[in-house]
Curated annotation (Swiss-Prot):
EC class: transferase
Pathway info: Amino-acid biosynthesis; L-histidine biosynthesis; L-histidine from 5-phospho-alpha-D-ribose 1-diphosphate: step 1/9
Chain's gene name: hisG
Function of the molecule: Catalyzes the condensation of ATP and 5-phosphoribose 1-diphosphate to form N'-(5'-phosphoribosyl)-ATP (PR-ATP). Has a crucial role in the pathway because the rate of histidine biosynthesis seems to be controlled primarily by regulation of HisG enzymatic activity.
HAMAP family linked: HisG_Long
Signal peptide from the UniProt entry: none
Record-listed E.C. numbers: 2.4.2.17
Organism per entry: Saccharopolyspora erythraea (strain ATCC 11635 / DSM 40517 / JCM 4748 / NBRC 13426 / NCIMB 8594 / NRRL 2338)
Name of the featured protein: ATP phosphoribosyltransferase
GO biological process, one term: L-histidine biosynthetic process
Cofactor(s) listed in the protein's UniProt record: Mg(2+)
GO molecular function: ATP binding; ATP phosphoribosyltransferase activity; magnesium ion binding
Amino acid sequence: MLRVAVPNKGTLAGPASEMLAEAGYRQRHEQRDLTVLDPVNDVEFFFLRPKDIAIYVGSGELDLGITGRDLALDSGSPVDERLALGFGGSNFRYAAPAEAGEWSVGDLAGRRIATSYPRLVTDDLARYGVSADVIRLDGAVEISIQLGVADAIADVVGSGRTLRQHSLVAFGEPICSSEAVVIERRGSDQQEAKDRLVARLQGVVFAQQYVMLDYNCPRDLLDEAAKLTPGLGSPTMSPLADEKWVAVRAMVSRKEAPAIMDRLADFGAKAILSSDIRSCRM
């Protein structure tokens, strides 16, 4: 039986469970449930702290896990990233008091840096050849400067609102660009079962990025239509009762779909329909 770790709380928990459900896997109904058995798919899910998931997977106790890329890297566990899931995006960056003027990574030499990700910070500082005092805190690192514990911080930055609230400004290149990812232990067993789960999730990710367009097109404009909606290789075309028209079906980028529909209508396409895709295999 495949054993899979899922975040039990935080911003990754809800989307991760929803994506697994879309992929056809049973998920928990009560927040207090720590495990869920899915006998149909021969999978057992374990709901764990996101920060611990890479450790469990890396130790070989679990086969796969969903966690943040930043958490997996900071754990130092022997895990590999199998699939980026497209949610929970953030950047991990240095930040310092705005009143101190412009900072660079070099200015951190000899300074105290508070962070919940000491391994990531230590590795990044080494890349720049900078020696600093890295102070590990479990959360709310923004307040550490005000309390005199640190001179700068390194933390996950989303909208930047929290930094602004504490009069901090981010500087330097992102230490890590993170999102939710599927991880596995290097050299672990059950490869076929793991590949199947990853393929299902990949189908959901892909479906979220595309829509299906159906429309009727004048036969003499098919070449132009095919350029607009090439699909994933070639659009599907079917004859209609009126020989001057052809039905066309193609997958297009969800973001680009409205503009493509406008252009199709402009050159004479009719009955243009956009529909969501639940899942797919490519």
